[in-house]
C-alpha cells in the first residue's frame, strides 16, 4: 500500500466529539503535526471525515 502524510492545519476547538476522536485515531493532537499512515480505505475514510481540518502532504 502507498503511504500518505497527513497534517493538521486547523484547530479542533468547536469541533464535534466524533471529529475530535477521529483526529485522535489518526494520531493528530497538535496543529501542524504530521503523521504517516498506509492509504487503507479506513484511513482514507477518516481523512475524508475531517478533511476541513487536515491537509494531505505529498
UniProtKB/Swiss-Prot annotation:
GO biological process: translation
Keyword list, A-Z: Ribonucleoprotein, Ribosomal protein
Domain of life: Bacteria
GO cellular component terms, semicolon-separated: cytosolic large ribosomal subunit
Single GO term (MF): structural constituent of ribosome
Gene3D superfamilies membership: Ribosomal protein L30, ferredoxin-like fold domain
Subunit note: Part of the 50S ribosomal subunit.
Family as reported in the entry's similarity comment: Belongs to the universal ribosomal protein uL30 family.
Protein name: Large ribosomal subunit protein uL30
Amino acid at each position: 500500500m502507498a503511504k500518505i502524510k497527513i497534517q493538521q492545519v486547523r484547530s479542533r476547538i468547536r469541533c464535534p466529539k466524533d471529529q475530535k476522536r477521529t483526529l485522535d485515531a489518526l494520531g493528530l493532537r497538535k496543529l501542524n503535526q504530521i503523521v504517516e499512515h498506509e492509504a487503507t480505505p479506513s484511513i482514507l475514510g477518516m481523512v475524508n471525515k475531517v478533511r476541513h481540518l487536515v491537509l494531505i502532504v505529498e
